[in-house]
Amino acid sequence: MGQLALAAKITHVPSMYLSELDGPRKGTRQDAIEGHLEIDRRCRAAGVDTIVVFDTHWLVNANYHINCAPHFKGLYTSNELPHFISNMAYDHRGNPDLGVLLAKVANEHGIATLAHPATTLPPEYGTLVPMRYMDTDKHFKVLSVSALCTVHYLSDSARLGWAFRRAIEDHYDGTVAILASGSLSHRFAQNRST
């Protein structure tokens, strides 16, 4: 049936956005932006119709969640770093059918997962920053999956990924890329640091 055509661990460092703007950081993240453009190129070459982003800035306290609204559009300001990302425009198509399917198969495999196809919840910057460079023309549909899970078992996260692959390959009529958006480990500089 469906195909998982590409999987990647990617950055979403907010200074990518600052790198576009006039000021002292202009151009400093061009290499990261070029990397995202290459992933975009590879997804298009593979015929990807939907990008599923595991977003490490979407914090949840119970279950796994899939933001699969039919459309995401607005202005985004980061509640974590409003001095880095402020009023960043976004406009992406969603994929409610795939989101509901992913949740259904995950639940069948014992992983409590909720799809949200009729929500006003906007994606977080772990989704929006990469899509700013990979989906400039609304070519792809986009899903966002909560990946900052405060009370989850690591083994359940692995099983969730396995269930998503089964859903895509066994039941979905299309081609998907999965992106793990976020650092494996990082720390922000302390206040008063130089």
Task: Identify what each model region corresponds to.
Residues 1-194:
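Soluble secreted/lumenal catalytic domains
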